[in-house]
Amino acid sequence: MRFHDAHSLGVNFRVALESALLRGVRLSYLAVEREPLPREVLAQILLPLPRAEEVFAALLKAWPTSRFLGSWGELRLLFLDVREAVLPSCWATAVYLDPFSPRANPEAWSLPVLLKLRKSLKRGGRLATYSAQGAFRRALREAGFAVHRVPGVGKREWTVGIARGVPPG
């Protein structure tokens, strides 16, 4: 399993890790985070994911380190703006796009960033996000995704983009 996201509270990472541990597969996870939160803040966010929480507690002891390896897999963290990040091509099977809203953080939702994320995904890879904003969905299509609205948790709907064909540009 391979994922990429904005790390922030580590929720997406922990959910992906719990899933990988339950299925007995290794996780290779790359997260981009412009402003990492302090260890003390991260330690307060507890989730009902017993396997992942055990690993996460160990990771917090070395926080903020940029690379963690374990029997469960690997977590790499890039502490910079996603616009500056160099991402591996055709590497990821999934991307969690989880910055603040398009209004609050328009750069992270821009076409250049979406193109970068599309190029990092393998064909058929998925990009998932809580935003269902029309302008964002149009930019996602332009970046080479088939765009779908899906039922959301706590929201009316979310967006899933499926990487199709060869990435544009």
Which residue ranges define each predicted feature?
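Conserved beta-strand signature within the Rossmann-like core of class I S-adenosyl-L-methionine
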Residues: Y96, R123-S131
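Class I S-adenosyl-L-methionine
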Residues: A132-G169
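S-adenosyl-L-methionine
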Residues: M1-H4, V41-S89, E107-P112, Y130
